[in-house]
Amino acid sequence: MALGAAVQADLLTNVDRQDEVLLLDVIPLSLGLETMGGLVEKLIQRNSTIPTAAAQVFTTFKDGQTGLDVHVLQGERELVEDCRSLARFTLSGIPPMPAGMARVEVRFQVDADGILAVTAKEQSTGTTQSITVKPSHGLTDEEIENMLLDSIDHAEDDIQLRQLREQRVEAERVLMDAEKQLGEHGALLQDGERAAMEAAMSRVRELAKGDDSHAIKEAIHALDESSRPFVERVMNQAIRRVVAGHSVEEY
């Protein structure tokens, strides 16, 4: 990592040597994917020596989701709109499952020539989709330097924006789950619980429209607390259904 940083710094400051040392010796800008909320998840960090590879497992956000959009990005910023788009494709054929159950491994592999191969594989079926791209194509040294300087200038704001969007995504997930549980297991609610949960849900929904990530986080926590007894009854009912008709020896 230190060697890669030294090479990159030299390239940005010493024009005379740019013909001798290629940008392809290291990854000049981080490579990643778009995730929920328009955020960038970096898989290969800037200044990684090549060839190199990295993989990460992602999942679905909604029940019954059968496709996963893969948006490949380049850059150091935290938001999609502030990074360079390299490629897009969709992995189709994911078996319908509850949200969060599917497992899709996305692998980035950069060869010695700087060619990036991106492969997405749904783990239960083996369904695979891939694409190749050359990240350095059409990118000048000056543009790379400007992107790096831009990321430094906006580092603090980017962190705050990322935290806000992460909390908004979590708020959306929690609200979808709460609505699902109320719809499917409302009969398990006790006196006053529905009103308390719906009030907490309204609070989360309203704060998620604002810009206070801490307030959103606190509202999500309050919803979790208000729904805890109800959720425990839902889980206990599910466990009883699973063990019904089975002896202890079977487990």
Which sequence ranges carry the predicted segments?
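Oxyanion-binding/catalytic loops of NTP- or PPi-dependent enzymes
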Residues: 1-251
